[in-house]
Amino acid sequence: MTICVDVDGVLTDGKIWVNHQGEIIKSFNNKDLGAIKELLAMGFQVHIVTASSWPGSEFYLKRSGAEIHNIRNKESISFDYQIAIGDSAWDIPMLQRAKYCFCPSDASKEIKELDGMHILESKGGQGVMLEMVRILTEWNPKL
């Protein structure tokens, strides 16, 4: 089973800090990194998808062991997946293509209203993937 995960707003809280030199800084929850590793150990394939060219995402997330894709247009995702996690309008094509779609509790209204959407308790950047481990552990026999 393959999971497709957005970065900004799912693995981060969507905030961007810019220092006095113009360098971008984003915040990830380290528990999500561990959760991605756990999902891989459970036999799931995890693909992390971002439209951002910020090198910090790849630098941090490559430690998870997941495949990382820099894709501007999520309609052009070329691999098969059954589960998608997204939070904004940019993610709609990815979410609509999945058999099961999930979003953080602070996702945009249009995402929450998509057919078949499962709204998580976690906000973006606050343990979304950790919650997914729990859900998929409970659901696994049914998938």
PLM segments and residue spans:
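Alpha-helical substrate-recognition element adjacent to the catalytic core
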Residues: 1-73
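Mg2+-dependent phosphoryl-transfer enzymes with acidic/Ser/Thr/Gly-rich catalytic loops
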Residues: 62-66, 74-143
